[in-house]
């Protein structure tokens, strides 16, 4: 992911827009800054937007001075104020890189050495998923970034004209598009924490409801409401082979324990769940029938569905679907199935903690 990203950053001519939940001082950030600084000197418009909670390691002083010293504009999403407010839960969990409106990236990756498998105190390997989008579809990620960037403007600063950032060839493609041909579909989408549309959840639900043979899912968390639980179980009851890969080891203990209680409900009702043994799995991937799916930043939990700003890419009959399925199948070889019988062997304190804190599931 990062090697390909670095190659594309070097080709940027007009702008580089970067939006992440977690950005922290690290080796991979240093590598990126070397390139971004050079591009900024060449006149490329370089901007970074990051979340104040996820990127707590970047202080406000670094936000205003550190990136500025590299010629990079930066903004913090919802600066953290240590008092209760209703917006505290609405974090910018998106992962977006848009280069000239022609190449974009999204997925589960953040900008830390752990995600790049350079260094980790906790896990032998960090398994994640990202996707590269080229062509007219990339413009959507440009627009998503600009929306979030301009929301952070001061009241006296007017909103930018977004059309100025859409490549002319993309505009031409839109005007001449006939809807004909055998090419697959690539549809980027964003989920807004404020509008109640729950797009991320509905994309997952659409895939489950329209699958006829199999659904392959990779997710780090499983903390879901009754409606999503019913959708997963109903797909299995229709004869669809529904398989989930989840972590064997936790990054957040309480979320891990609570997630295991939901997994119990799933495996008791025909959904197959596998625990990844080789490290930590952070991928957010849904694939159905080897023909449709999605890759993005959206976890299978309440926070991603209802509280966070998220993004992803819906795919239909594209080459990347088959590649994602192959990756799932390969990853499953490094897993152990969680059956009803071996669920009982989960330590009592994990199961007890899960049931105690499950009441707080809607906040997780």
Language-model segments: residues:
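Charged, low-complexity intrinsically disordered terminal segments
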Residues: 1-364
């Amino acid at each position: 992911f990062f090697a390909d990203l670095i190659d594309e950053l070097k080709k940027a001519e007009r702008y580089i827009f970067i939006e992440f939940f977690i950005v922290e001082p690290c080796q991979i950030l240093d590598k990126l800054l070397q390139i971004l600084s050079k591009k900024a000197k060449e006149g490329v418009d370089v901007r970074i937007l990051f979340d104040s909670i996820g990127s707590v390691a970047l202080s406000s002083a670094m936000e205003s001075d550190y990136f500025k010293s590299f010629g990079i504009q930066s903004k913090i999403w919802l600066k953290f104020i240590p008092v209760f407010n209703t917006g505290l839960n609405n974090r910018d969990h998106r992962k977006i890189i848009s280069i000239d409106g022609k190449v974009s990236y999204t997925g589960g990756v953040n900008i830390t050495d752990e995600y790049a498998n350079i260094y980790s105190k906790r896990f032998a390997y960090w398994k994640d998923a990202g996707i590269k989008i080229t062509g007219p579809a990339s413009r959507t990620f440009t627009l998503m970034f600009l929306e979030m960037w301009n929301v952070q403007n001061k009241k006296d600063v007017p909103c930018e004209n977004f059309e100025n950032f859409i490549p002319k060839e993309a505009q031409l493609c839109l005007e001449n598009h006939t809807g004909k041909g055998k090419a697959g579909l690539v549809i980027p989408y964003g989920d807004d924490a404020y509008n109640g549309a729950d797009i991320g959840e509905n994309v997952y639900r659409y895939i489950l409801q329209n699958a006829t043979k199999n659904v392959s899912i990779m997710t780090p968390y499983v903390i879901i409401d009754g409606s999503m639980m019913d959708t997963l179980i109903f797909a299995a009851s229709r004869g669809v082979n529904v398989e989930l890969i989840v972590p064997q080891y936790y990054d957040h203990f309480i979320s891990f324990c609570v997630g295991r209680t939901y997994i119990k409900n799933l495996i008791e009702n025909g959904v197959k769940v596998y625990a990844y043994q080789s490290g930590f799995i952070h991928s957010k991937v849904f694939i159905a029938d080897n023909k449709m799916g999605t890759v993005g930043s959206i976890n299978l939990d309440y926070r991603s569905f209802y509280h966070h700003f998220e993004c992803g890419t819906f795919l239909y009959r594209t080459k990347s679907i088959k590649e994602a399925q192959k990756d799932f199948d390969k990853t499953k070889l490094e897993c152990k199935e969680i059956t009803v019988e071996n669920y009982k062997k989960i330590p009592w304190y994990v199961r007890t903690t899960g049931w105690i804190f499950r009441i707080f599931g809607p906040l997780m």
